[in-house]
Amino acid sequence: MSKWYQGNGKNSDVVLYSKVRLARNLADMPFPNRMSKEIKRSATKKIYATLKSSEVAQEFDVIDLSALSKIKAVSYAEKQLISADFAKQRETSAFMLSKDEDVSIMICEEDHIKINSFAPGQDLDAAYEKADKIDDIFIDNLKIAFSNKLGFLTASPINLGTGLKASFALHLPALAQSNAIYKLSAMVGKLGLSLRPLYQNGNGDIYILSNQISLGITEKGAIDNANAICDQIVKQERGARDQLKDNFEFEDKLYRTLGILKSARRLDTPEFLNSISLVRLGISLGYFDIEYKTIGEMLYTLQNASLIDSAKTPLTEQMCEKLRAEIVREKID
């Protein structure tokens, strides 16, 4: 079965993917940070049983992190399917994952239920539709914590109300080149959203745009607002890219970067992310005949833990760098 990240969507030159997260809690249990291990296990069984008895049961696998290695758990976090903190709590953690990995459901992380739904490109509606379908199953069969005044009750006050977080992963290399990211981030913040790097130190020029307000606004309102801001950022990034088209020195830099990737025998993670970012930019400018989904698949699968997990054998840092370079050469040759 193909994975969701192997597809393309609207505005894929800038928007890698859309993500909707819904946070829900059981009304008759304390928040996870106040749960004993026994109560947490009981809640996990209750939530899992609800989904297993539903019409979508065959679409999901349950992943018991306590039965997995640390590397396997971290590989799920690298793919944004679970949080990094959740991956560290392997002893009492479990989540459910759809067959093509477009929906994950963390159980007893910060909240009792956290539904994450992905769609390629700019398509929050598709991501929300999938998350909402799962949400309805839980609401119809479990007593979910809800206040007529505040909406859905969550462990963090930030998520009160809809419990919805709408996000985009944006590739913004041209805006990053022109040092416009900080100004853009400040502007976005004034509109109730945030813009932050996906990877450490801004490697890869990929930024996450997400709403920061879920109280006093409807799900549709939050999604429409996020889409409107995303549209503006896409327009700005494309404008900045247009200014690079006739820059011979920059064109040379892009081709040199592709040449390095085609011949490199070792690639550490920062060099990989930054080089792939430039190649992806070169694709959008019409220089390279490589599919966006090829880049997306590499971003999704070539970080250290994912490499080690796919190799099915322990790898040193140097071995990861060697294997990463080998796979990149095969993918873009």
Task: Please describe what each predicted stretch is.
Residues 1-149, 164, 178, 182-185, ...:
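Long, Pro/Ser/Thr-rich low-complexity/intrinsically disordered regulatory tracts in eukaryotic proteins
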Residues 151-169:
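Conserved phosphate/anionic-ligand binding catalytic regions in large, soluble enzymes, centered on
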